[in-house]
Amino acid sequence: MELRHERLLASLSIGSLALAFAAKDALANVFGSFVIIVDKPFKVGDWISANGVEGTVEKITFRSTCIRTFPQELVYVPNSLLSNTPIINYTKREKRRIEFLLGVTYDTTHDQMQKLVENIRTYLTNSELVYSDTVMVYFRDYADSSLNIFIVCYTKASDTKGFLAAREQINLDIMKILEENGASCAFPSTSVYFETPLKSETKNN
């Protein structure tokens, strides 16, 4: 009889411990959802990245947040985890950065290069697509196969489609500036020099 009571007490203790852990997790998730509601780091429809998961927020419940990833997978992240991890909210960006090197060929002259830099800088500064105070355009490098112009600006459009449309238009307009100044984009190339001239062979018909 005494052994049976001991077993019953042991079972109750294990059950109580399991319930305590379950309650702890549940309370942590409820607290996490409360933090999300109060702090508002994101809302339904936002594009976020947190704890290795990136996608669009579809639903926020007391237990978890549902995120639709770009491969269209549905990931449920516990709110307790989200409330204690860094969150990147891409939707809340006010502007987006464009940065690239524009490589032109080595036969570009000093005057051409100077004009290119000035024209691109003036174009971007006056463009409605970007913030004028963020524009940087400089002749920067003598690279292996190109003379590099360093270009940086921030677009006013922060959503993906708007950003890509702005970047496309900027690329097309810079291409036109290159054409107007008689310059060409460079590509990797190799020059081979022979110490002695190669003999040319001809076939007699």
Predicted feature locations:
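Hydrophobic alpha-helical transmembrane segments and their immediate juxtamembrane helical boundaries
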Residues: 1-25, 31, 35
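Transmembrane helix-bundle signature of multi-pass membrane transporters/permeases
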Residues: 13, 52-55, 141
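Short, structured secondary-structure boundary patches
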Residues: 27-30, 80, 201-205
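Residue-level signal for pocket-adjacent positions within structured domains
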Residues: 3, 72, 77, 82-85, ...
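Solvent-exposed, non-transmembrane regulatory segments of membrane-associated proteins
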Residues: 88-90, 96-99, 104-205
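Soluble accessory domains appended to multi-pass membrane transport proteins
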Residues: 35-131
